[in-house]
């Protein structure tokens, strides 16, 4: 299949690799960007795959506490201009109130607010989407919002201040699991295979590569889990060590960031500004 300039551009942004390397990787995978990233990690052509899943949509994350649970809601729009619009925010908060009143599913929320959403789209001039709703149970909770774009709720057995600090850590460090032991075996095995191939591409024999990587897996599971990460407020200690000192535990967390996994369509800048001006006069 023909590789487009847009595909090459996306792969460059997500890996930091050169244009020719990206084009070559995409050609080898018939345009499969995710497979290209994995192959480039193995070959060392990419600086990192850490930019995968870059934020590519606008909107807001809202949080509200209910009876023994909290709700996190994501509502999207096309530009950050509309994300700050009072009509958009009023709509998002109305959806949040209904969600918090009874743990309403995303499908039911979308259906219930479809007519209101369509009217708002006509008024504002941008597409709007009630995208995600998440519920988290727990008697002891703390939440943290970083601007309008990141929302975190943490549950556990700890004082409110400790949980709040952990929530701030989750917002900044993006752990995927609570504990290293929570990382699924298939995730560990996939990373192990990637690391072994990287080591072998560096000239290490397979037996030595496997021994080297065995030690790296402990580091990997620590890096992707909350309790294994260095605490942002006290980097010489892990979050797990801080919790142990305080006699505290974290049982669960949810972190939402605006636009995760959404590819934002590139718009002509002049046309976008004109649309924003027109909307403001409506």
Curated annotation (Swiss-Prot):
It comes from the Bacteria. This is Elongation factor Ts. Belongs to the EF-Ts family. Residues 79-82 are annotated as: Involved in Mg(2+) ion dislocation from EF-Tu. It is found in: Cytoplasm. One of its GO terms (molecular function) is translation elongation factor activity. It holds the Pfam family EF_TS. One of its GO terms (cellular component) is cytoplasm. Keywords: Cytoplasm, Elongation factor, Protein biosynthesis. Associates with the EF-Tu.GDP complex and induces the exchange of GDP to GTP. It remains bound to the aminoacyl-tRNA.EF-Tu.GTP complex up to the GTP hydrolysis stage on the ribosome.
């Amino acid at each position: 299949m023909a590789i487009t300039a847009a595909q090459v551009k996306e792969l460059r942004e997500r890996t930091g690799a050169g244009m020719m390397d990206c084009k070559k990787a995409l050609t080898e995978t018939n345009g499969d960007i995710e497979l290209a990233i994995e192959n480039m990690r193995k070959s060392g052509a990419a600086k990192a795959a850490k930019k995968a899943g870059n934020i590519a949509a606008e909107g807001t994350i809202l949080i509200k506490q209910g009876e023994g649970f909290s709700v996190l809601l994501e509502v999207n729009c096309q530009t950050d201009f509309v994300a700050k619009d009072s009509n958009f925010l009023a709509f998002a908060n109305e959806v949040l109130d209904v969600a918090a009143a009874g743990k309403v599913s995303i499908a039911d929320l979308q259906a219930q607010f479809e007519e209101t959403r369509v009217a708002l789209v006509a008024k504002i001039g941008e597409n709007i989407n009630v995208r995600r709703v998440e519920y988290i149970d727990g008697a002891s909770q703390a939440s943290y919002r970083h601007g309008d774009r990141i929302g975190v709720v943490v549950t556990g057995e700890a004082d409110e201040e400790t949980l709040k600090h952990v929530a701030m850590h989750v917002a900044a460090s993006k752990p995927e699991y609570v504990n290293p032991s929570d990382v699924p075996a298939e995730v560990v095995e996939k990373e192990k295979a990637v690391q072994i191939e990287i080591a072998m591409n560096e000239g290490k024999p397979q037996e030595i590569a496997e021994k080297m990587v065995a030690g790296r897996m402990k580091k990997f599971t620590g890096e992707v889990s909350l309790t294994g990460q260095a605490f942002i407020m006290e980097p010489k200690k892990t979050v797990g060590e801080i919790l142990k000192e305080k006699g505290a535990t974290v049982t669960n967390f949810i972190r939402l960031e605006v636009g995760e996994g959404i590819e934002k369509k590139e718009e002509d800048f002049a046309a976008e500004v004109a649309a924003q001006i027109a909307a403001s006069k409506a």
